[in-house]
Amino acid sequence: MDCLRKHNVDTVMHFAAQTHVDLSFGNSNDFTSTNVVGTHALLECVKSHGVNKFIHVSTDEVYGEVKDDGKDLLEDALLLPTNPYAASKAAAEMYVEAYRKSFQVPAIVVRSNNVYGPHQFPEKVIPKFSMLLQRGQQLSLHGDGTHTRRYLYAGDAADAFDTILHKGQVGQVYNVGSSDEISNFTLCSMLLGQFGLSNETKEEVYKHVVHCEDRPFNDHRYAVDGSKL
């Protein structure tokens, strides 16, 4: 609150969150504390101080799994989270919407695909795999590697948030989507190629992969329609 007043803040973009899905299965209380209680605390500050826009950064995972033959989801699709991380982000969204309606907090919600880019913390799959390859270590692959994700470059994500900051409408939800959907196995293969390692066949890829136990529940894919933005 003191920071908002001291610097006369008129816009808040709320990125802060615990985001490592694997950790949420074994330490879900921290995710509730950070993602839900933390968002609630920030909303209280914003309600008291007053801002022009409160942009809440959520995730495509709040929609839950999208079947292989399913259509890309629009912003009005049901929220059906399947892991503790996604549930905490969906719960945070409910607080944001409640404060928008009850206290006129000028909120906007953004749900994006997986973002990647330089200097990303290595709990995320692309920097994690890159770091392992730099060290000459094997890549850990959940299950059979057929799960797919869509990836969004950090610079493109920044452009989307800049657009929402300047043109986004209060009360709206915006998907920030990518069409770059690849399986985890294909991601392994692509990174091996970038490091000059053999990846022409499955057998060559598997030489650099160790299969690990899958998550208690692992959404096969996510797919959002970002045409609104």
Q: Residue locations for each model-derived region?
A:
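N-terminal Rossmann-like NAD(P)+-binding domain of SDR-like oxidoreductases, especially those catalyzing
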Residues: 1-115, 184
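Short, well-ordered alpha-helices that flank and scaffold nucleotide-derived cofactor binding pockets
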Residues: 5, 44-48, 97-101, 131, ...
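Residue-level signal for the nucleotide or nucleotide-sugar donor/cofactor binding architecture
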Residues: 26, 34-37, 76, 83, ...
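Short, flexible micro-motifs
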Residues: 41, 61, 67, 89, ...
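A glycine/serine/threonine-rich, flexible loop-to-helix segment
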Residues: 69, 122-130
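C-terminal substrate-binding subdomain of Rossmann-fold SDR/epimerase-dehydratase oxidoreductases
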Residues: 133-229
